[in-house]
Amino acid sequence: MDVEKTVSETIKKYKLAKKSDNVVVALSGGKDSTSVIYIMKKLGYDVQGLLIDLGLGEWSKIHNEKMKKFCGENDIPLTIVDLKKELGQGICFIKAVLKKQKNLTGCTVCGIIKRWILNKWAKKLGADKLVTGHNLDDEAQNVLMNFLKGNVLLGVNSSPSTGGREVRGFAQRIKPLFFCAESEIMKYARSKKFDILYEKCPCAFGTYRVDTREWMAGISDLEKKKIVENFQKLVPKLRAGSGRELVVCKKCGEPSSSELCNFCKIISNI
Ligand code: AMP
Ligand code: ZN
């Protein structure tokens, strides 16, 4: 697989971005988001990086420094947002409280919080598009996880562009790596000798996603592509029957699928 070609084709086929768009890329410091910002810059898009400093000790410090260096070398503007300043608490504290209060796993909490901060800051930066580094493996895992949870409808928004359409006032979230296998992105990032951390997040253990990733280890990239492509055929039907519309959260004003967004639901008692 040619990762650059697949990204370029996905952007064209799904009309993910225009050259005139202000494209904000959510940078975790890992191989996926680093590759996608590099490729989009190379393809001529107007990109800038947005990194949330999660305050996870040395891990975050190294990511921050490496991303500063990478963006500097590639002439890419970078904004770093301090999670503790944004929320008044560190991520570990919030996770510990929510584990006790609502038995929510760390990755769920981290995902909801990151999404909320990224949306808010993308708007502040005047983004037309907010890019994340989600890849084919992430999407195949989602299909399987939702099926095993007995709730295929959870995948109703699965698409290279979230919601499949633009919502006024919000930066549309797009996933140019939607059809790129993780193994190929890893090869790509290494071939480019990106000076980044290649390990997974140290906090990601003991979660349903981690288990699912392990179960899927024996499935080939081609099969993963078929899973994702077949599910994409189902999405319009799910969407038509779901009645789910993206609305504005009545508390914080961010995009939501119900009156209160997931962030406001989980964070209100902390
Ligand atoms: P993950 O949920 O960690 O697999 O990350 C999925 C995507 O979310 C990454 O490819 C990034 O685009 C984005 N992301 C994750 N962590 C961060 C972070 N600390 N700051 C900004 N974006 C992030
Ligand atoms: Zn809210």
Question: Where do the protein language model's features map onto the residues?
Answer:
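Short cysteine-rich clusters marking metal-coordination/redox-active sites
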Residues: M1, V248-C252, C261-C264
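ATP-dependent adenylation/nucleotidyltransferase module used to activate substrates
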Residues: M1-N157, E182-S191, C261
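An accessory alpha-helical subdomain
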Residues: W215-L234
